[in-house]
Amino acid sequence: VSRKSDVGIEGKFFKDRLAFTVDFFYDVRDNIYRQRVTLPEYAGMITIPFSNVGKMHSYGSDGNISYHHPINKDMSFTVRANYTFSENIVDNFEEPLYAYGYQSSNGKPLYILRGLIAEGLFKSKEEIETSPEQMFGKVRPGDIKYRDVNGDGVVNNDDRVPLSYGNQLPRLMYGFGADYTWKDLTIGFLFKGSAKVEYYRSGLYNDSGWI
């Protein structure tokens, strides 16, 4: 179920040469179809069923602006730009009972990336011995030193936290372009981009395994 509110404004100036539109929206979706995760064992089900148990909301804005300038009866040019900004937040996804609040998806963007917090590099063997134990392999001086977020003396998957701007969905998309027209000939260009998005860069792989 989706409930969306939208408000916008548009205008034209200078004999319709300059035109723009801007919209703002707020969208709430509930009863999202998701797999259950908290059914008790006495339910007696072999496979966990799906149900309408999710809720999230999104908000944002989009707009465009253009300017058309006739030079003479045969020539003219037009420049334009547009943008779309959108943010989504999980309000309630059924989840396991996590030991730490930062492990939950609720209250955070959908598909947010998680990772360890790097505090620098180990400078000596003595620093390694006096630091929380890093559980991802043997550590040597020069290796990355990760933060023990929960303070239990070891660095493991329980210390993975949501990363700033760590969202696999672009929050901002934009573009701009221009056209030049002479009689029946039009030459133009268009540039598009996205921002506020991150991806994990996976390692290289060959026949022997990960490099």
Predicted regions located by residue number:
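Short, glycine/acidic-rich beta->alpha junctions
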Residues: 3, 57, 61, 166-177
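Transmembrane beta-strands of outer-membrane beta-barrel proteins
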Residues: 18-20, 77-79, 176, 182, ...
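Extracytoplasmic gating/loop element in the C-terminal half of outer-membrane beta-barrel translocons
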Residues: 141, 194-211
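Strand-loop-strand
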Residues: 99-102, 187, 193-197
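Conserved active-site-proximal loop/helix segments of enzymes involved in bacterial cell-wall
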Residues: 32-38, 91, 157, 201-209
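Active-site proximal loops enriched in glycine and acidic residues that flank catalytic Cys/His/Asp
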Residues: 11, 23-26, 159, 189-195
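Extracellular/periplasmic, surface-exposed regions of secreted and cell-surface proteins
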Residues: 1-113
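Conserved small-residue
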Residues: 54, 68-168, 208-209
